[in-house]
Amino acid sequence: KPVFYRVLQGSIVDKTAFMDVVTASGCRECVIIADKGFYSKHNLSALMSAGMKFILPLREDTVNVEPEFYENTDDHKFDGVFTYNKRAIWYRKKASGNRGNFIYTFRDDHRKAELQGNYVEKVEKHYGEQPRHPMDVLKETRMGYFSFCSNMDKHPKEIYLDYKERWDIEQCFDYLKNSVSTSASHAHTDEYFRGWAFLNHISLLYYYGLINALRNT
């Protein structure tokens, strides 16, 4: 459930604001689960300097996973496999650098099949400016793969499940966007806006209280 909020000036860069909020919250025993785009050497260093645990998704073109790994079609390249919602999830865990970080790489075959199907369908319908052939899908070796950088030495399935919990955060954003009035966000005074933000936080607490009650019934 939401435990902290802070009003920041709109001129502050998102990534800078994030670290300011982490510092102000006094958060210690927690795990930072970010979204794609947050990972960078600067942000990674800031989190490690603050002593924070983290799970940071990497971009599809990340250099933290060697291209040969994607090109290798032998599934023995993985450390193992587990199931999630009746889907096979292949995984590999690899140490990164000398500061205790790991790169966790997963492949979801169900997701891979969806992406391949979408690719072939677009080719058949002649989407895009460049001429392509359906068999070009074989060149897209990274389909279905996703990777995380984390400083937690855990079984890959635990990392995967921890990241999946971010859905609760997405629900929070959806609630704020779709269920809470945004008219007050254009208030002309700081006091009015801060009051609106406080009521939003209280509203979220009640919302999550209801969600948790329904989950436990």
Task: Indicate residue ranges for each PLM-predicted region.
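Anion-binding and metal-coordination hotspots
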Residues: K1-T217
